[in-house]
């Protein structure tokens, strides 16, 4: 049971408390439900207002770039009815997440607290006291036998770069739809900073929506681009063309020079090169304010 008043006398016990309602949290719930009976109680907490994790916040034109049947909780099947090669849209992924949650609710007694931010937990023999805060600021206290922190990478939306001016407008795909009116009424060149999935999806959306418009992409030296049609062809072509996964992973491994770079969101970083003495990750600058998980600097708040 969750109590809004921590001093309340009666507290109902949950078997499991799961923090995070994304793909990690849903898989944790699915596994836990396999060990519990229908009358046992489970509670789910997430800071977002619905199930879906990072997919709730991400840009509207995102696609799931993998066979969608494999992106699920446990062995819960999709109800989309599309070919396995179909690249699921944001809404289709969110609908499947909701379907997974509905299936789990048939297996156990599930209580959900969306819009609640996890704050801390305290363990005692046979019990975990979890403290969270609702979206309106009220304290939320939950007691459970087990706690599963399944918030994954705890990804937050990207803020625009701080470089806007009268002639340059900086936007973030997470807050500005590249297919929206603001972009449509402009005819200037577009510069996409980054070479990951977000950058490639954004460049693809711009090229598709505005044929002939100048689109530039700035990527770092470690960026590796592939052609999906050549690497993972669809239909009968996949029987005699494409690349074996073992060959792909071998090529990627050979491109790695052994250098590891740790970086937080404020930009502080540390590079570990081959042959260098091992140092703890807490040797990042003491001024770092961006911790998300250990091991990190004691004063780093957003990794």
Regions found by a protein language model. Name each.
Residues 24, 50, 154, 198, ...:
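Conserved Rossmann-like nucleotide-cofactor binding loop
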């Amino acid at each position: 049971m969750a109590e809004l008043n921590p001093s309340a006398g009666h507290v109902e016990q949950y078997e499991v408390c799961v923090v995070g309602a994304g793909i990690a949290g849903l898989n944790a719930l699915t596994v836990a439900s396999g060990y519990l009976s229908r009358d046992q109680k489970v509670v789910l907490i997430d800071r977002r207002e619905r199930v879906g994790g990072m997919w709730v916040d991400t840009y509207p034109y995102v696609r799931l770039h993998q066979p969608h049947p494999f992106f699920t909780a446990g062995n819960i099947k999709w109800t989309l009815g599309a070919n396995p090669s179909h690249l699921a849209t944001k809404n289709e992924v969110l609908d499947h997440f909701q379907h997974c949650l509905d299936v789990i609710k048939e297996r156990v007694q599930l209580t959900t607290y969306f819009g609640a931010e996890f704050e801390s937990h305290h363990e005692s023999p046979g019990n975990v006291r979890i403290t969270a805060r609702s979206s309106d600021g009220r304290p939320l206290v939950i007691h459970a036998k087990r706690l599963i922190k399944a918030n994954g990478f705890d990804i937050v939306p990207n803020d625009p770069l701080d470089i806007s001016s009268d002639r340059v407008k900086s936007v973030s795909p997470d807050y500005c739809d590249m297919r929206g009116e603001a972009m449509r009424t402009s005819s200037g060149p577009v510069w996409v900073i980054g070479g990951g999935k977000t950058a490639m999806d954004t460049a693809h959306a711009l090229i598709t929506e505005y044929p002939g418009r100048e689109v530039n992409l700035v990527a770092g030296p470690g960026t590796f681009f592939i052609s999906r049609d050549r690497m993972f062809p669809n239909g009968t072509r996949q029987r005699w063309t494409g690349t074996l996964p073992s060959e792909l992973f071998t090529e990627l491994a050979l491109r790695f020079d052994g250098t590891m770079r740790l970086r937080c969101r404020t930009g502080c970083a540390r590079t570990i090169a081959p042959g260098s003495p091992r140092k703890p990750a807490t040797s990042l600058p003491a001024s770092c304010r961006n911790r998300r998980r250990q091991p990190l600097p004691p004063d780093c708040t957003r990794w």
